[in-house]
Amino acid sequence: MNVEIISSKLQGTIDAVTSKSYTHRALIILSLLNNCGKIINPSICEDTITTMKYLNAMGVKTIIENNVITVSKQSELINPSFFPYNDNSCTSIRLLLPIVTELFTEANFLISEKLFERLTNTNLESYFDYQFSSLENNKIMLNVQKKAQLPYLKLEKTSQYASGFLLLSVLKNSKFNFDSITLPSYLLMTIDYLEKVGITFDIIKAENTTQVNTYNYNLINYYNFNVEGDYSLMAN
């Protein structure tokens, strides 16, 4: 599968940089597909490089050449003894935590104290059981485990955990409950992306909540598509 990320225009006049939000999701989705693929015109920045390092630790090979990232793997994804040091990228860890805890039940991440504080200030404890130990040089070893039952997904502080859980749709049919009737733009972007690889969504709105059911019966491994949006370098 090849994904081309098209730079959009802000208000129709200013060229926006390629979206790192799309690049994160493309890297993760391709890594979960059997035959992987290529990302054309990706955003190469600190955040997306961190996502690639995490995927590399899981046995995914990523090669950057001529503004294309080639994503491949030779076997099932593996759980490293710990994921490589991450100083600042909340996006990478929030999007991947739902996936690695689903695949491996628990995982260890070497992170900075600053990143640990950012994670714990954005509902980490709502979705995962965790323990941590302080190391030298202001580093933290974070052990994260899958909760027995997933609660309502909170969208107030960040939708990145929620997007990570939605990305699980590539692996299995799922049901998610959100604490809002309005889904934020980044979550809708994730849904749009997943629909392009064949995931079907059933979205049911109640008075103050939204239920999203996902079905991967028609998952596509070989379809090429383009994505476009005004997300630039923002993250939410």
For each feature predicted by the language model, list its residue ranges.
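Structural preference for solvent-exposed beta-strand-turn elements
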Residues: 1-236
